[in-house]
Amino acid sequence: MDIELTKKDGTVIKLSEYGFIVNDIVIDSMQINTKYQDKENMNGRILMGSNYISRDIVVPCFCKVKNRSDIAYMRDMLYRLTTDIEPMYLREIRRKEELNYRFTQPTSDDYVKLDKNNFPDYEYSRHDQQIYVNGKQYKVIFNGVINPKQKGNKVSFELKFETTELPYGESIGTSLELEENKKVGLWSFDFNIDWHAGGDKRKYTFENLSKGTVYYHGSAPNDQFNMYKKITIILGEDTESFVWNLTHAEIMKIEGIKLKAGDRIVYDNFRVYKNGVEISTETNIAQPKFKYGSNKFEFNQTVQKVQFDLKFYYK
């Protein structure tokens, strides 16, 4: 078991590579904030709404040292690796099956080989290798205080993280990588992806059409400005009023400027661009939104091309 931390500068850290053994990875469900309102002379209360706030992730781990004088060194190294004040991405790593090793009849010449962390280095099968459990990552920040607990030459720690901007798990890959079948290792079984050739659930680029359907795999909707999505549209006709819609979004409009066939319109979260120049003030501010399953889209003209580049989010 292990965790992988990707820092803001691109540095990638696995605790096992520094001599720390992870006991468990506890990913809590999301904290929910529910608001109610009381009414005078009314029994009960009125539900005003709920929203997800954050998620806690706890990672108990330990290290063993040859000499007790090394304890301070290992302790300070763990602090340096994990206690950043900037967000980082966390991935979960586990073995596919319970660890097994080959039993042999010992002889007088036998010895146990040790790895670089002084743990027995048994001859494992390929099923004993540690793997990423899924294609999700969590944007987290270190939260809390580490209190080392020493017992002999073993020191135990508990690392506490919490999600920052979003409480959701985020797909590492994008819809375009999924469509192009790139980096298959980015995806996992729980994403429920249809890998058959030509499957509609992996199609995110469309040409010469006025309406169609795009599939969103995430269990949490991609409906906020701080969720990754970029919709690129190549217009097929000259117009001064371009209108389109998605199943779960408000009608999106661009009006008051001249648009030509071949113009490249990009919806980059809450900003809109025409051929690289921002035109957000010429829109009705509505943004694309996607929910699990099929999301129908329709334009008021036949566009040359539309491409949906987005990430999927999970509860």
Task: Report each predicted region and the residues it spans.
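Short, intrinsically disordered N-terminal pre-domain segments
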Residues: 1-9, 94, 309-315
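Solvent-exposed edge beta-strands and adjacent loop segments
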Residues: 1-58, 130-148
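Short polybasic amphipathic segments
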Residues: 2-6, 88-91, 241-245, 272-274
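Short amphipathic beta-strand/extended segments with alternating polar/hydrophobic composition
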Residues: 12-19, 102-106, 125, 132-142, ...
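Oligomerization/assembly interface segments of phage tail-like spikes and tubes
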Residues: 44-70, 78, 152-167, 295
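Compositionally biased, low-complexity regions
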Residues: 51, 60-86, 94, 98, ...
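Short beta-strand and beta-hairpin "edge-sheet" elements
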Residues: 87-168
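Intrinsically disordered, low-complexity segments enriched in serine, threonine, and glycine
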Residues: 171-315
